Amino acid sequence: DRHVTVIIDVSFSDDVKIIKDFVLNEQCPFIQSKEEEGLIKFEWFIDEETKTGTLIEVFKDPISWEKLADKVIGTPVNIKFNSLFIIEKMTVLGELTDNLEEKLQAAGPMVKNYVGGIN
């Protein structure tokens, strides 16, 4: 299976309304506007009490992830994401391209390669 699932666990200190507004009215529309066909899912889950969240991204393959990352990294929306959230943990289920591995090195992602399963 060539799918790549990216799980980003974050924490935040801003009011939950600010976070939800960013996710729903800025980040999601921005990601959707990039029209990356290989993006299968881009979903947020938030625990308001602990001010933590999880972003799950699923891609058709590693190249699709790299294409979207190239369109997003360094943009104002990406910079705002980095100012609103602290990335506590990034887990990549599947392969990384060499280019993405280099770009994400600072985030210290935990990478787990696919072994098998039922799809």
Could you describe each region identified by the protein language model?
Residues I73-K80:
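A short, acidic, amphipathic alpha-helical segment used as a generic capping/interface helix at domain edges
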Residues D1-G53, K60-K71, S83-N119:
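Short S/T/G/P-rich N-terminal loop/turn motif that feeds into the first structured element of a domain
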